[in-house]
Amino acid sequence: MKEKDLTFEDKLWKAADKLRKKVEVHEYKYIVLGLIFLRYLSFAFEEKRKEIEEREAKQFSESLRFSICEDRDFYIANGTLYVPEKARWDYIKKNANQPNIGEIIDQAIEILENEYPKQLKDVIPKIYSRVNLDSHDFAYLINLFSQIHFGKDHHAKDIFGRIYEYFLGKFTEAEGKKGGEFYTPRSLTKLIVEILDVKEGRIFDPACGSGGFFISALEKLQREGIEKEHLSIYGQESKEFVWKVCKMNLAIRGVEGDIRWGDSYHDDKFFDLRADYIVSNPPFNDSEWGRDRIKPNDPRFKYGLPPENNANYVWIQHYIYHLAPNGKAGFVMANGALSGGSIEGEIRKKIIEDDLVYGIIATPPKMFYTVSLPASLWFLRKSKPKYMKGKILFIYAKKMFKAISRRQNVFTEEHKQRSLKNSECLKMASQKKR
């Protein structure tokens, strides 16, 4: 990721922000991110279409090639959504200056909803025809987002995710809230997924944000030649808007997941789920999680009810509760969870005594795009192999990073491989018992 790429999001935001004064922030974020989503969906579709045309050019007649290029099932089988003509970006752009462009965009969304009800129903609000923007405003945004160059393959999806993360943080700040960790850095999601050796089974993220862990898991399966249908995806997200973004993120990959909107603290949507893999990046040190609203004898908190002023061990116990007998968990956690005393210290002691922790990696600072708090990667397993019994592997990786800007560090591929080598016993632990 180059420095010039990082300034691109800022330029895009400043350009899009010019119209924000015309519309309420809670509506404008849907307008902007909905358009970017439509833009990317068409981009991915057109790239796949070009690939088909080039491949089939010498084998079939023009009419037959056209028929193949309009085969909906072919695109879905290849991890891309087929986009009907009147929902395509070219059609929207061609009509950008029409007085009814808002209706045209709403109709495009409805077409996609009808085509993919499980993935997209009610995900993008159809508000374009009723907001306080005229055709000139829409033309400005459409032309602006037409300039986004997504690149190729996984890089294209990285750019999409980065733009979404950046805009999510900006819109959250504009609403007077603290910017959240909606998009976990890919260098972290990829490392956790590799260490857990995610393959077939059930993967669960109860604080799924925009779905970054799911994407890294799906990409790992693709690299290893495993069909994505072998991995069942479950996620819960407390913020309605971010829940919608996660649904979009899976949709652009042609994946159906069971993603539900709700508060994991008090409304566990997957109470009976026992997952093979739990991956997560929960809110750090949440001081207003609602301890007084926890029901008596909640089975998740067998090690004790965490304090009101910090939810770190709410999440850790939530993960333990949802693990299958041979399940594995890998998650990002604020460093305070390693040293908190009083109730937290007692809970941590009991978890260690039950031999559930099998590894912790101390990460460098500034790994998150919008949050600078230091963090560690935790790895849990309910059933350790014999050689890991009574042991916890600690890896100090605080100096293992590449600075890509003043405010963000990343793990490079070399750093990831070094971490994987150092944590080989963790990978072995995940491979021995399957």
Protein language model annotation of sequence segments:
Residues 1-199, 258-269, 362-365, 387-398, ...:
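Non-catalytic, mostly N-terminal accessory regions of nucleic-acid modification and defense proteins
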